[in-house]
Amino acid sequence: MELHTLKATPGSRKAKHRVGRGHAAGKGKQAGRGQSGQTKRSTVRLGFEGGQLPLFRRIPKRGFNNVNHVEYQTVNLVDLENKYSTGEVVSYETLLAKGLIKRNLPVKILAKGTLTKKLTIEIPTLSQSAKTAIEKVGGTIIEVK
């Protein structure tokens, strides 16, 4: 006896019954699904509760999506302190190069943490507290559109 000559015992491996393939196959016509009705057909759609008002329609609608909403990537003063040295320029390109931002979205600098280095900021959007913190250290903010 060798592995490549092994065979299953006759009758131990039964072929699966293919239903709905005609009378001669033994499972034709109703294919084991009984008389006509909901259970004979395909499954009910997702969220269907047998005719009862479904949950997604029972719960009230809330809110709206503002078409003018702008999502910003945020960079904190702590990040600038850690990644930049004194006198460097902070721009969209340098932020991308240093891995502080990833997506192609506008950037906003926020005032979390402290800043001790003089930096030149070329980012259009800053929080008011970040602006004052940068100017207090002696950094400059260049207006960019």
From Swiss-Prot:
Region described as Disordered: spans on this chain: 1-42
GO MF annotation, one: structural constituent of ribosome
Bias-annotated ranges (Basic residues): 13-26
Record carries keyword RNA-binding: yes
InterPro entries: Ribosomal_uL15, Ribosomal_uL15/eL18, Ribosomal_uL15/eL18_sf, Ribosomal_uL15_bac-type, Ribosomal_uL15_CS
GO terms of biological process kind: translation
One GO cellular component term noted in the UniProt record for this chain: cytosolic large ribosomal subunit
Organism superkingdom: Bacteria
Keywords: Ribonucleoprotein, Ribosomal protein, RNA-binding, rRNA-binding
Quaternary state and interactors: Part of the 50S ribosomal subunit.
Function: Binds to the 23S rRNA.
Protein family membership: Belongs to the universal ribosomal protein uL15 family.
PANTHER family assigned to the protein according to its UniProt record, in alphabetical order: 50S RIBOSOMAL PROTEIN L15, LARGE RIBOSOMAL SUBUNIT PROTEIN UL15M
Record-given protein name: Large ribosomal subunit protein uL15
